[in-house]
Design a protein with these regions (language model features):
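Hydrophobic transmembrane alpha-helices and their immediate loop junctions
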Residues: 1-188
């Protein structure tokens, strides 16, 4: 399988997924930043919603690239249920961002499934850690929020339940799962 190749269908699904995530992002950012006066400008809220969307896209692309490196077919697809839940969560106090997922086909092993599942949350853990380190040294509130968003994305996805990334990682290697989950906890 080609690494970092996108079909027209996948690009359409990624674009629609990104729009849904950005919508939730605007509501979520407004919710968490409402007590921070300097972040309550329209420009800052939009920038944070874009960063939120990029964090989601990088998470999904990490899954895709990881699967493709294992020689598997991998493309992002919207799901009707996920898109509706994501859309509805704009109006709910709890935000659920799951407009779709990277669909993977081919002969997967427990290891390739686990490593591919880990790739998304690990990307968010790295982004959160880098932003936290810079935020600590610069006292930049904007970076704290980006770090927090990425930590939440990682933590939520590492829950070892159902179709979550965490279950694939847990089945593959419980120690790796514990380290990843443990790394995301203090970042939140």
């Amino acid at each position: 399988a080609k690494v970092f190749w996108f079909s027209t269908t996948e690009l359409k699904h990624l674009a629609l997924g990104a729009l849904l995530v950005m919508g939730v992002g605007l509501f979520f950012i407004h919710q968490i930043a409402s007590n921070i006066q300097e972040l309550m400008t329209t420009e800052i809220l939009v920038i944070l919603a874009i960063v939120f969307t990029l964090s989601f896209l990088l998470h999904e692309l990490a899954h895709k690239i990881s699967a493709q490196r294992f020689g598997l077919w991998a493309e992002f697809r919207l799901t009707m249920q996920g898109a509706l839940i994501t859309l509805l969560s704009m109006l709910l106090p709890i935000k659920i961002i799951s407009p779709g997922a990277v669909m993977i086909a081919g002969p997967m092993t427990k290891e390739s499934a686990g490593k591919t599942g880990l790739a998304g949350p690990l990307t968010n853990i790295i982004l959160s850690t880098v932003c936290t380190i810079i935020a600590v040294t610069t006292q930049n509130t904007f970076l704290w929020i980006i770090a927090y968003i990425n930590a939440l994305i990682a933590l939520f996805n590492l829950i070892p339940f159902g179709i979550m990334d965490g279950l694939k990682v847990f089945w593959w290697n419980k120690m790796v799962w514990a380290i990843a989950f443990g790394a995301s906890l203090p970042l939140t």
